[in-house]
């Protein structure tokens, strides 16, 4: 078996698998490979246990500006359209209602203004008053005594929407389709990249077991591990990484659909939301929490897996200055401390209950169950030159046949849009072709028309 490929993707999560499919379906490349360190695809951030299983299209994510929502909507619709085209309904993609709610006069005023801006972007977006919310999500309104909550409450959303995705199942489908299209493609599991070497016009990917795979172009879609790999080759030395781990709590099956809350614009992390779980029937997931930890990947034991690569990246005065500036802000400091408390036994559950009751006011302590084994680390990039936290996705383009992607949420939602960008870069570098019109025709006819 030849170990030489036109392009090799490091990382078998949904982003890497989406690019594997996109190159196989729409480009003239002959051979593409994925190398993945785990024994199966999509076992870390793309696992159904690691994320909220949401297609983040911007309609109920209250931290999105209208401009960002327009872009994210098109990205999300590509991923949704692919799943529907491939018949993945009720296998990978699920239909449910969804809404964002504002609680209290200040948040209600914000939601009213937001609706006026967003109804033009999302056709069919509906405003919900308190009575309508009670009809759609009775447990959002009913208190423990069976009496309606006293706060003013308003929301908007969709009564029915393809809003839930099992990204692990989607990843598997991407790869199955790619292998049908190009039988010479390969997937290498249990291949943890130790080193990447440039050898003339080819890159050698060397595993911890001394196996070697060769590529004319390397795309690193390895989540938290992307930046350490980049820095091992001398790229991205001006960057650091703040790994933030999210945790969830289970409650009984009390929500009919997704319920999101208003996010504090000063905080770079999602506000608490409720999601009926797609893989564990009869459970609703509430979260996430957000806890910074010195690990590139979450493990059951807190001390297990502390990353030496991360310590090497972050043990310098610039990173400490960024951390100090963040913690100097009272709201951010209180948020960080509160989320540290959420992880503590007994007291954490009691404190988290207060946040969860914003969504389901009748919740009791007995209803909450810490979701062990759920949640994962998201790499937040630190710019050591600007001394600031960089929000969103980060890309290091070397223009030398290797690109590094760091894709925190909503990277899974945008996987096909990101795959399009990366695929176009790869084919341009290799002098190959890409069927852009057919890509849009299949996945985003709206963009083709415009």
From Swiss-Prot:
Single GO molecular function: L-malate dehydrogenase (quinone) activity
Annotated GO biological process: tricarboxylic acid cycle
UniProt protein name: Probable malate:quinone oxidoreductase
Reactions listed under catalytic activity: (S)-malate + a quinone = a quinol + oxaloacetate
GO CC, one annotated term: cytoplasm
Record keywords: FAD, Flavoprotein, Oxidoreductase, Tricarboxylic acid cycle
InterPro entries, A to Z: FAD/NAD-bd_sf, MQO
């Amino acid at each position: 078996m030849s170990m030489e490929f036109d392009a090799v993707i490091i990382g078998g999560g949904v982003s890497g698998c989406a690019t594997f499919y996109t190159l196989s379906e729409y480009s003239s490349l002959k051979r593409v490979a994925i190398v993945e360190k785990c024994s199966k695809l999509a076992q870390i951030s793309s696992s159904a246990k690691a994320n909220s299983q949401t297609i983040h299209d911007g309609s109920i994510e209250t931290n999105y500006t209208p401009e960002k929502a327009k872009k994210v909507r098109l990205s999300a619709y590509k991923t949704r359209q692919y799943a529907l085209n491939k018949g993945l309904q009720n296998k990978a993609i699920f239909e449910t209602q969804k809404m964002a709610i504002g609680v209290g006069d200040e948040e209600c005023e914000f939601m009213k203004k937001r609706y006026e801006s967003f109804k033009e972007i999302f056709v069919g977006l509906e405003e919900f008053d308190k009575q309508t919310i009670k009809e759609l999500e009775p447990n959002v309104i009913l208190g423990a005594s069976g009496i309606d909550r006293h706060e003013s409450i308003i929301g908007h959303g969709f009564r029915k929407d393809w809003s839930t995705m099992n990204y692990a199942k989607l990843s598997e489908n991407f790869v199955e389709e790619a292998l049908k299209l190009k039988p010479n493609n390969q997937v290498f599991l249990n291949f943890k990249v130790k080193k990447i070497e440039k050898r003339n016009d080819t890159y050698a990917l060397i595993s911890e077991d001394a196996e070697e795979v060769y590529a004319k172009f390397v795309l690193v879609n390895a989540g938290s591990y992307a930046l350490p790999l980049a820095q091992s080759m001398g790229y991205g030395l001006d960057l650091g990484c703040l790994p933030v781990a999210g945790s969830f709590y289970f409650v009984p099956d009390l929500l009919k659909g997704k319920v999101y809350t208003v996010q504090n614009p000063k905080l770079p992390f999602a506000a608490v939301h409720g999601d009926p779980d797609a893989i564990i029937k009869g459970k609703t997931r509430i979260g996430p929490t957000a806890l910074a930890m010195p690990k590139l990947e979450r493990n059951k034991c807190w001390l297990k897996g502390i990353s030496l690569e991360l310590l090497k990246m972050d043990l310098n005065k610039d990173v400490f200055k960024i951390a100090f500036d963040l913690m100097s802000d009272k709201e951010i400091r209180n948020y960080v401390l509160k989320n540290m408390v959420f992880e503590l036994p007994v007291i954490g559950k009691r404190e988290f209950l207060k946040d969860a009751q914003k969504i389901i006011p009748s919740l009791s302590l007995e209803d909450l169950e810490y979701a062990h084994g759920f949640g994962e680390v998201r790499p937040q990039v630190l710019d050591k030159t600007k001394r600031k936290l960089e929000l969103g996705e980060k890309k290091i383009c070397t223009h030398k046949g290797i690109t590094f992607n760091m894709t925190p949420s909503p990277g899974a939602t945008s996987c096909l849009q990101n795959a399009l960008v990366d695929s176009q870069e790869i084919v341009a570098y290799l002098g190959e072709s890409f069927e852009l019109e057919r890509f849009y025709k299949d996945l985003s006819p709206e963009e083709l028309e415009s």
